[in-house]
Amino acid sequence: MENTTGKIIGAAIEVHRALGPGLLESTYQECLCHELVLHSVPFVRQVSVPVIYKGVKLDCGYRPDIVADDVVVEIKSVVGLERIHEAQILTYMKLGQWKLGLLINFNVTMLTKGIRRFIL
């Protein structure tokens, strides 16, 4: 997972260098996915994460942006990351039983200041 995390961060930095801040999250997601393909990092997009309630799987609309090798990636393009963004990725990680998550905010001048790593 550490190797995958490094590749994801490297790919995100490449996207940010090319595009800079200020675009839509969907643009950064498309470009990051393209970079992951170029770096041979297998991933899935918008995978449904069910909630198990009283033994029943329910689709409640939880869909992380990207999951690559059990690393959850949530992409933002906001003025500043808020607690709700952290809660969102932590919820995905708990429901999907993933141990590692990256919250990446592309709306910063230096991307390294927009990356938060979460471990459960």
Task: Pin down the residues of each PLM region.
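Nucleic-acid nuclease catalytic cores
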Residues: K76-L120
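Solvent-exposed, charged helical/coil patches
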Residues: M1-P42, T112, R117-L120
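A short acidic/basic microdomain associated with nuclease active sites
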Residues: V37-Y53
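Conserved catalytic cores of phosphodiester-cleaving nucleases, focusing on short active-site segments
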Residues: G20, P64-L81, Y92
